[in-house]
Amino acid sequence: DIQMTQSTSSLSASLGDRVTISCRASQDISNYLNWYQQKPDGTVKLLIYYTSRLHSGVPSRFSGSGSGTDYSLTISNLEQEDIATYFCQQGYMLPRTFGGGTKLEIKR
């Protein structure tokens, strides 16, 4: 199986900040990389697919980039509603494995 690693398990930022979350695959996944958002209430939403394509209804402050084994999700101008845990997932090969998640919190 392809292993997905999110080296940062939690991240603190202030509202209005630009935040970048990284993800690394154990092999080249040819841009088949998705990002999901899990809210504190458990609601899960697809944000980005195929590295950089925004899912319908997702605000443009979210963006994705990367290639090969290294990928990132960037949130520009962080808003309160963005507080959540973010997971990367590779869609290159079955099983479609996930990273361990990065929990985004407000800096106090």
UniProtKB/Swiss-Prot annotation:
Disulphide linkage map: 23-88
Region ranges (Complementarity-determining-2): 50-56
Keyword hit for Ubl conjugation: no
Region entry Framework-3, spans: 57-88
SUPFAM superfamilies: Immunoglobulin
GO CC annotation, single: immunoglobulin complex
Keywords assigned: Adaptive immunity, Disulfide bond, Immunity, Immunoglobulin
CDD domains from the UniProt entry: IgV_L_kappa
Region annotation (Complementarity-determining-3) ranges: 89-97
Region feature (Framework-1): 1-23
InterPro entries: Ig-like_dom, Ig-like_dom_sf, Ig-like_fold, Ig_sub, Ig_V-set, IgV_Light_Chain
Spans annotated as Framework-4: 98-108
Protein name in the entry: Ig kappa chain V-V region HP 123E6
Organism expressing this protein natively: Mus musculus (Mouse)
